[in-house]
């Protein structure tokens, strides 16, 4: 059973489908206002309806200045604080390691590691103002522990 999150507000990155979409819905159903930041700004076709309390916003977590402005604007709606950040945005690319394009490697590391850290830093000042001191939840993957030959950089980025 989920805790009562009435009056709480926070951000889920990469929530237009999959795990992020479901996390956003569960948090909203528990009473939170959930801002989902994704490249499309809307749920992917066929994933269903978002719960009441979920607000989809178009944004690129790789654009730090834009995220600073967006996060400040969202926090301002909630007395200058946020209660949670769920870093869910992530990418992968399937290719054997010996043929892996470095451009794809860089993209995976940027999105799955660097941007996760940057988003945490951007949100931290607002999270620490929360009555509950806020929470940062980073979504990882079993791939980090199992390893798969066709997604080596993804596995490394999720550890």
Model feature map: region roles:
Residues 9, 16-17:
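Conserved glycine-rich cofactor-binding loop
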Residues 30-46:
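Conserved glycine-rich Rossmann-like NAD(P)H-binding loop of the short-chain dehydrogenase/reductase
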Residues 88-93:
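Conserved NAD(P)H cofactor-binding loop of Rossmann-fold oxidoreductase domains
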Residues 96-97, 101-106:
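Substrate-binding pocket helix/loop in short-chain dehydrogenase/reductase
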Residues 98, 146-152:
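Active-site loop immediately N-terminal to the catalytic Tyr-X3-Lys motif
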Residues 120, 157:
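Active-site helix of classical SDR
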Residues 141:
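Residue(s) in the substrate-gating loop at a strand-loop-helix junction
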């Amino acid at each position: 059973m989920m805790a009562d999150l009435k009056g709480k507000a926070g951000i889920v990155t990469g929530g237009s489908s999959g795990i992020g979409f479901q996390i956003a819905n569960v948090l909203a159903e528990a009473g939170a206002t959930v801002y989902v930041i994704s490249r499309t700004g809307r749920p992917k076709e066929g994933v269903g309806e978002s719960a009441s309390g979920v607000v989809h916003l178009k944004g690129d977590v790789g654009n730090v200045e834009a995220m600073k402005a967006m996060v400040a604007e969202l926090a301002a709606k909630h007395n200058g604080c946020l209660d949670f950040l769920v870093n869910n945005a992530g990418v992968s690319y399937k290719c054997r390691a010996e043929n892996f394009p470095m451009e794809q490697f860089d993209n995976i590391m940027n999105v799955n590691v660097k941007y996760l850290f940057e988003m945490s830093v951007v949100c931290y000042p607002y999270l620490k103002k929360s009555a509950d001191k806020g929470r940062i939840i980073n979504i990882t993957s079993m791939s980090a522990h199992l390893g798969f030959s066709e997604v080596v950089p993804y596995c490394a980025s999720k550890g």
